C-alpha cells in the first residue's frame, strides 16, 4: 500500500481511512486465478507476488492455514529481508485490549513467527500500543472511562511473551503527556519488578502545539523511578518540537536527554507528509547530534509512505 507523495491535510480522515481502521476483511467472492490470467499481469513484481501467494496456499505449504494478519506479517518480513533488515519492532493496540483481541493476536504471533524467522531471518517484535486519548471520531465507538488502567492490566499479562518487548504511547498529540503519568509510573514499576529490558516509547513533539511534551515525557519516566532504579530503555517518537534549544531551558533539555540516555526517533518523511514539518531548517537533529543526544532514524510505517531505509538515509543526508 502506497500513497505516492500525498500530503495528509485532514488528520482525522487520515486516521480513519489510512491508519487505524484500514483492517482487511477476507472477501467472500474469491478470484479464480488461473495461469493464463496471471500471465496477463503486466507488472513483473506483482506477477511474482501472486505466484508466491498461490504457492503459500497450496496443500503442502506450511502457510496454508494462515490468517490475514499472519499473511501480513509474513509479507512484511519478506520485504524487510529484501532490504537487508534483520530486526524490526511494530506497535499494535490489540495487545492492550481486554479479552479476546490480545489473546487472539498472541496466539497468531506465537504460531507464525518461528516459521517467518526460519524463512526470512527477520525478527519481528511488538510494542504494546496504548492510546494517549480514547478514540471519539468513530460512530458508536465505545471506550471505557478506565481504559488506561485496563490497558496496563493487559500489558502486565501479554508482556510475558518473548515477542513483546515494550510499550508505545501513540495517537494524535493533543493532550499534555502528564495526563498519562499514572500509566507511565505503572510501566516503570513493571520494568523494575519484572523486565529490565522492557522499552517505553512515547510519541511526543510531533507537532508544535505542546512544546513541553518532550521534556515532560522524559520527566514522567524519571520521576516514576523507584529508589536506586536505573533509567529504563526510553525512546521519544519524533521529538521534532520542544522549547527553544537556544534558551537556558532548551540547553537544560539537551543535557537531560544526554544524561538519561533517551533515544530520539526521527521520521522525516512522516513529518513532511503529515504537514508537521514544512521548513527543514527548523529540524533540531543537528543540535541533538552536536550535544551527543542519542538519535535514530526510521520510516514511521514504510508501507504507508512507500519509503525504505535508503530513501530515508538520502533524505537525512540532504538535511545534514
Model-derived regions, located:
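Metal-cofactor-binding active-site regions of metalloenzymes
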Residues: 1-320
